[in-house]
């Protein structure tokens, strides 16, 4: 079972993976060479003021002097720029976290003075035991090579395009907004800080006033999809029986518009739903809101819609309430990610109805994706079923060791071999 959490979904691949020492060692060496780099080459013009510029008529290239300067590197254009680690250390130097005090950082998103104003945030520290009122972002990091600059405490700082879009969409016109977003609030270049902050993820999301589930910008008729979900979740929908709910829904125009239902399927095929961290971020939230572009719907309503659709599909006596075409639209809608999260949500709040199970947790996380394979283990550490295994996140450990230690702890705790299936 756990083998499938690794790349290529194969127990055979896992055996080869952990036996291939050179692969892991080389990866580790690359990480060390990058993160521990103190000096890099920089190109500077020579003392001749004219030599730093190309003679446009002759086409002669300028002369350069190679020099070393700590914390600087050359970009793709040959220009001297501060390295990522140097920029990060500058940003976080005034807000170093004390793990003994269980501190986190929160960001204050500054108001939008005009539509074209750059995004500016202020960082501050807080105790997770007594946090301010903040909202936690749950989002997809996306392509790490696509970066967009913002200003953190007045200093330029690069973030992913998807997080940038979220901040731009959430930014208020006349007041600031207190948020938590891992890419900014955790020094990603500081491994020891990451190790400790990952242990606090459950508290970060459970202490938030609200978790904002950011699906991305509006595209592929996502506005239609969000509107359709809202239509299926009228007030008291949870207590409404199926005939009454369908009567309410069908009375509204364009509810079974084919274009809208295709849009719903695309919405739930977005990469966000396959993130390994989604389960923990939503399950432990006290209140969650799904945002896609400018549209939003409460997570609770989304869960109600999913349960109602499942009920409609599982009770043949309801089939006559819809035409064959309408029923097909409901039954073909992809909702497995929401279903898994809803099930774990119930297990936290009503364990007498849905018993907690470590094996069920592993199955829920099995099909998820993570840029760092270690995260498919570490994302489970907030769950009681896993916390008893006493596993601590450590991003310096080789991937195969992280998985081997987890399997050993599972076997010792559960005394079952089903994890090997």
How would you describe each model-predicted region?
Residues 28-32, 37, 45, 62, ...:
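Non-catalytic, regulatory and substrate/membrane-recognition segments associated with hydrolase enzymes
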Residues 7-8, 21, 73, 205:
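Long tandem-repeat architecture
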Residues 155-181:
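Active-site palm subdomain of RNA-directed nucleic acid polymerases
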Residues 176-187, 205:
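Active-site beta-strand/loop microenvironment that shapes enzyme catalytic pockets
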Residues 2-19, 28-30, 64, 82, ...:
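Residue(s) in the substrate-gating loop at a strand-loop-helix junction
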Residues 152-161, 390-420:
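Short secondary-structure subsegments characteristic of cysteine-rich extracellular domains
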Residues 20-26, 33-81:
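Long, intrinsically disordered, low-complexity tracts enriched in Ser/Thr with interspersed Pro
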Residues 14, 75, 84-136, 140-143, ...:
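Metal-ion-coordinating, acidic/His-rich active-site neighborhoods
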């Amino acid at each position: 079972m756990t083998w499938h959490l690794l790349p290529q979904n194969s127990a055979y691949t896992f055996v080869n993976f952990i036996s291939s020492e050179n692969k892991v060692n080389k990866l580790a060496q690359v990480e060390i060479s990058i993160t521990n780099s103190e000096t890099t080459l920089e190109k500077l013009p020579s003392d001749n003021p004219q030599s730093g510029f190309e003679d446009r008529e002759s086409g002669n290239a300028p002369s350069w002097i190679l020099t070393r300067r700590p914390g600087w590197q050359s970009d793709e254009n040959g220009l001297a720029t501060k390295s990522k680690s140097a920029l990060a250390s500058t940003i976080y130097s005034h807000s170093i976290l004390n793990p003994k005090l269980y501190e986190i950082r929160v960001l204050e998103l500054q108001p939008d003075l005009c539509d074209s104003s750059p995004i500016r945030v202020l960082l501050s520290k807080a105790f997770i035991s007594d946090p301010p009122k903040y909202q936690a972002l749950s989002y997809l990091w996306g392509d790490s090579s696509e970066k967009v600059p913002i200003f953190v405490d007045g200093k330029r700082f690069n973030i992913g395009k998807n997080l940038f879009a979220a901040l731009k969409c959430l930014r208020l016109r006349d007041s600031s907004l207190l948020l938590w977003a891992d890419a900014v609030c955790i020094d990603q270049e500081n491994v020891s800080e990451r190790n400790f902050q990952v242990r606090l993820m459950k508290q970060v999301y459970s202490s938030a006033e609200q978790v904002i589930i950011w699906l991305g910008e509006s595209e592929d008729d996502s506005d239609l999809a969000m509107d359709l979900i809202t239509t299926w979740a009228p007030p008291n929908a949870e207590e409404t029986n199926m005939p009454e709910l369908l009567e309410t829904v069908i009375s509204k125009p364009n509810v079974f518009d084919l274009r809208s239902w295709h849009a719903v399927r695309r919405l739930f095929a977005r990469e966000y739903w396959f993130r390994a961290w989604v389960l923990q971020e939503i399950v432990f939230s006290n209140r969650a809101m799904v945002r896609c572009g400018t549209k939003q719907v409460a997570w609770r309503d989304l869960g109600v819609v999913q349960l109602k659709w499942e009920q409609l599909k599982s009770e043949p006596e309801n089939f006559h309430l819809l035409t064959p075409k309408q029923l097909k639209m409901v039954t073909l809608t992809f909702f497995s990610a929401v279903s898994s999260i809803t099930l774990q949500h119930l297990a936290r709040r009503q364990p007498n109805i849905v018993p907690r199970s470590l094996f069920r947790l592993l199955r829920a996380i099995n099909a998820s994706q993570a840029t760092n394979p270690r995260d498919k283990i570490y994302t489970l550490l907030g769950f009681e079923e896993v916390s008893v295994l006493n596993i601590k996140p450590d991003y310096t450990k080789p991937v195969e060791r992280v998985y081997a230690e987890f399997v050993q702890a599972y076997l010792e705790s559960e005394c079952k071999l089903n994890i090997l299936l």
